[in-house]
Amino acid sequence: MEVVHWKECEDKKIDKFPYRGQMHDVIGTSVRWLSKHGDDGHGYPEYGLRLFTIQPGGRIPIHNHFYHQTMYILSGEFECWEFDPATDEVIKKAICGPGTSIYIPSLQPHGMKNTSDQPSTFLCCICNVYDKETML
């Protein structure tokens, strides 16, 4: 059993996210890894629980990944986007506040921004779903 208090976890600023071979700016965002276990064969955990904080006006740009992801909004308000994988155009928007969960399937392009006037937080649970030999 592992027991961790969130304040004991390093708060790491995120500056960039990769998407389609290019790096995209992440604005006003930090993450604390509350739990990460296993090895996916590429230096990433097989399972993880993260606490994200996004400052007012901050955003996470379009990106995707192999792992499934579920986010649970703790505080503030976010506009969440789903993008068409062929065109990268927004195909769905949702305003999400405390108590809302958002599921993102493997490889679905997505992003979000903080639309509130306060730092906003969410938990993010990830689980890798790909074979160790398979990478895009």
Locate each region found by the language model.
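A short, N-terminal "cap"/entry segment at the start of jelly-roll beta-barrel domains
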Residues: 1-46, 94
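Double-stranded beta-helix
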Residues: 2-11, 85-88, 109-136
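Conserved hydrophobic/aromatic beta-strand scaffold that supports enzyme active sites
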Residues: 31-33, 49-53, 70, 93, ...
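Conserved short histidine dyad/triad with adjacent acidic residue
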Residues: 33-37, 48-65, 106
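Short glycine/proline-enriched turns and hinge-like loops at secondary-structure junctions
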Residues: 45-46, 64-65, 90, 115-117
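Short, conserved beta-strand element in jelly-roll/cupin
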Residues: 51-55, 65-80, 84, 125-127
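Short beta-strand His + acidic residue motifs that chelate non-heme Fe in jelly-roll/DSBH
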Residues: 60-63, 80-82, 104, 110-116
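Short acidic-glycine-tyrosine-enriched beta hairpin
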Residues: 85-106
